[in-house]
Curated annotation (Swiss-Prot):
The gene is acpP. 4'-phosphopantetheine is transferred from CoA to a specific serine of apo-ACP by AcpS. This modification is essential for activity because fatty acids are bound in thioester linkage to the sulfhydryl of the prosthetic group. The keyword DNA damage does not apply. One of its GO terms (biological process) is lipid A biosynthetic process. This is Acyl carrier protein. It comes from Bacillus mycoides (strain KBAB4). It is found in: Cytoplasm. Belongs to the acyl carrier protein (ACP) family.
Amino acid sequence: MADVLERVTKIVVDRLGVEETEVVPAASFKEDLGADSLDVVELVMQLEDEFEMEISDEDAEKIATVGDAVTYIESHL
């Protein structure tokens, strides 16, 4: 999990301009990290590129926190 979490954290820090210490599994992209809907779409696209996978729109809607993203990615690698 650490490797996936580290990679997700780097993407979130780069995309949202937040501090690395703010990017914890329980952090909500919108409420805690200040992402808007477009930011979330762009994050999902960047995660797809980074992990060479496709995340369906239906699944993307369920990814609300950093932990959700890590869990989803780990279960689909």
